[in-house]
Amino acid sequence: LFSVRIVVDNVRTGLDDQITYSFAESMFHLGSYRKKEKQMDEKAMELLSVFGLESVADYRAANLPYGKQRKLEIARALATEPKLLLLDEPAAGMNPNETEELMETIEVVRKRFGVTVLLIEHDMKLVSGICEYLYVLNFGRLLAEGTPKEVLSNPEVVKAYLGE
C-alpha cells in the first residue's frame, strides 16, 4: 500500500505496465496520452467500485480504515490481471466485521475475476468459510489436506491449531 498516495493512484500503479506511451506523448501530453490516461482512470475507478471504494478514491490511502486498506491492496493487485493471487494472513489485525467483509471480497475475486486465491491464514472461520481445499502445515510439515470439513475434523489438526 502506498499510504501517502490517494486511493485511485494506488490502483493506477497496478495498471502502469498495461499502458505505454512514446516519449513525445508523455512529454507533450498529446491526445493519445490523454486518452490512455483517461482509460487508466476509468479502469481504476471500475476496480474501486467493485470493492465499494469509489467514494474514497481521492482520500489518502493512510486515512482509510484497516479493512478498506486491505480491499485497496487487493484491488491494486487485480489491476495487474493476475491468474493467481497470494494472500498472506489477510485477516491479521482485523475485527470480526472486517473479516466478514474480507471473506466477501475474496469471493468476488474468485467469482468475478476468475482468479485462483492461495491463502495463508490462521483465522479458522475465514479459512472454513471461503476455502475449497486446505493444506495444513505444522512446523513446516504437511499435517493434513482435504476439504475444510475433512481437515477441520482431523484430530491432529484440532490438537495442533484449535486446542484439544
Region locations from a protein language model:
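Glycine-rich phosphate-binding loops of nucleotide-dependent enzymes
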Residues: L1-E164
